[in-house]
Amino acid sequence: MPVDLSTTLSWKSATGEAATMLDELQPNILKAHVRDRLTVLFLGFGDAAEARTFLNGLSGLMKSARTHLQEVEAHKLTKAVGTPYLGVGLTAHGYATLGVTAPADPSFTAGAKAAVEKLADPAVTEWEGHYQQTIDAVLLLGDATAGPVRTLRRQVEALRPASVTVVGEESGLGLANANGDGIEHFGYVDGRSQPLFLTEDVDAERDTTDGVNDWDPSAPLEQVLVPDPAAPDPTVHFGSYFVFRKLEQNVRLFKEAERDLAHDLGLRGEDRERAGAMLVGRFEDGTPLTAQSAPGSHHPVGNDFSYDSDKLGQKCPFHAHIRKTNPRGSGGAEAPEEERKHLMARRGQTYGRRHDDPNADLPPRLRPAKDVGLLFMAFNSNLGNQFEFTQQIWANNPAFPFPPDGSQPGLDPVIGQGARAPQKYAPEWGHNNVAEATDPIPQAVTMKGGEYFFMPSLAFLRSL
């Protein structure tokens, strides 16, 4: 069967060109790979020939998307432990150094530094030092535990010549709540809503979670895959554009904002939890705010919801993080089918160690103010229409989405960048007695640096 990019793929029944694609595609693109322990290495190339030999050697340490999917299936059946993940990405400068034809996405060609003004990012001079330098490649080494990652790191280092330098390094460390769901440092379930590219994953979502009646998570392959132009056969060899951004979270500041908002709105007792939910769009346990006024619907965390019953923003504010970055057909600027095309496969991981429980009832002063955050990672088929669109046109745009009364909701309170103003909230869930907060929600997430990469096919790496 040929590779049909216009729909989802059943990997178990894939044959012909579709099977070849899976055998030559890197893991973690179509389906997330476990990476509770993650090492990220940013590399520079000093000698093109040695860099090519190094990349060729890395291909021998990598597994295919198909192998990863088979490991996941085996783990479900027998609890068999899979192999660690090694992902490889190249920047436009890396391609130029290798003397190889690079993918043509204009944002990729320009690089992340060129997007600073567009995305309202901090100036490059304010980024952490290694992100200010020229980066040619990224390696992702991930697994459920630290041991396999250390072993894989040693194998990578054994292949690395002196002319391939480690420009910088990051370490990811997964966080989970008492229910075992992954959370970010503000304490909220993260990564629950994802575009699903595999038919088997869509079926599992329908049959084993809260369903797919109000929100269909399926997405066509063309939303994440592009032909690999430098591979031996781009009709069956595919890759994906990869965004990496280090986002530091000031947990203390965010928890102060939650406290102050609850005070401004006169929320009492357990209803004070709704203050944070109005910023995020979900309660800490993942319960969607548009679905109910209190936490508790978390087994499993729900994703089958829309904003059709909340068209006035009386339950979940229009500016809540998850409503801004996935309006679920309610944004008002585009037809729902066009709006969906901006969604991307997010593969982020938290970083930084802390001594407090993110979900404990503690005063803000006991929360970390720096050195923790999110290593934001996402796969795209079009950087300008997915990641950059989401950040610039949705999160940073005070006029999006479009409420019926024509008002401006304001920035995404979590990841929005730009001038902030006080925003409106419903002191009573589901009622139209809107009140305005006294002060703007402070920016508690700071971008510390990043880059754009292309994750090529295994066939390309072997051909070097």
Curated annotation (Swiss-Prot):
pH dependence of this protein's activity: Optimum pH is 4.5 for the H(2)O(2)-dependent oxidation of Reactive Blue 5, and 5.0 for the O(2)-dependent oxidation of 4-methoxymandelate.
Binding site for Mn(2+): E258, E273, E284
Cofactor: heme b; Mn(2+)
This protein's UniProt keywords: Heme, Iron, Manganese, Metal-binding, Oxidoreductase, Peroxidase, Secreted
EC number in record: 1.11.1.16, 1.11.1.19, 1.11.1.7
GO terms assigned for molecular function: heme binding; lactoperoxidase activity; manganese ion binding; manganese peroxidase activity; peroxidase activity; reactive-black-5:hydrogen-peroxide oxidoreductase activity
Cofactor note: Binds 1 heme b (iron(II)-protoporphyrin IX) group per subunit.
Matches recorded under InterPro entries: Dimeric_a/b-barrel, DyP_N, Dyp_peroxidase
Pfam families from the UniProt entry: DyP_N
GO cellular component: a single term: cytosol
Catalytic reaction annotation: 1-(4-hydroxy-3-methoxyphenyl)-2-(2-methoxyphenoxy)propane-1,3-diol + H2O2 = guaiacol + vanillin + glycolaldehyde + H2O; 2 Mn(2+) + H2O2 + 2 H(+) = 2 Mn(3+) + 2 H2O; 2 a phenolic donor + H2O2 = 2 a phenolic radical donor + 2 H2O; Reactive Blue 5 + 2 H2O2 = 2,2'-disulfonyl azobenzene + 3-[(4-amino-6-chloro-1,3,5-triazin-2-yl)amino]benzenesulfonate + phthalate + 2 H2O + 2 H(+)
Binding-site list for heme: H321
Presence of keyword Glycosyltransferase: no
Compartments (UniProt record): Secreted
Active site: D203 (proton acceptor)
Stated family: Belongs to the DyP-type peroxidase family.
Subunit structure comment from the entry: Exists both as a monomeric and oligomeric species in solution; the monomeric form contains no bound heme cofactor and is inactive.
Function: Displays both high peroxidase and manganese peroxidase activity. Is likely involved in lignin degradation. Also has a Mn-dependent oxidase mode of action that expands its substrate scope in vitro; is thus able to catalyze the O(2)- and Mn-dependent oxidative decarboxylation of 4-methoxymandelate to anisaldehyde.
UniProt protein name: Multifunctional dye peroxidase DyP2
Species annotation: Amycolatopsis sp. (strain ATCC 39116 / 75iv2)
Protein's gene: dyp2
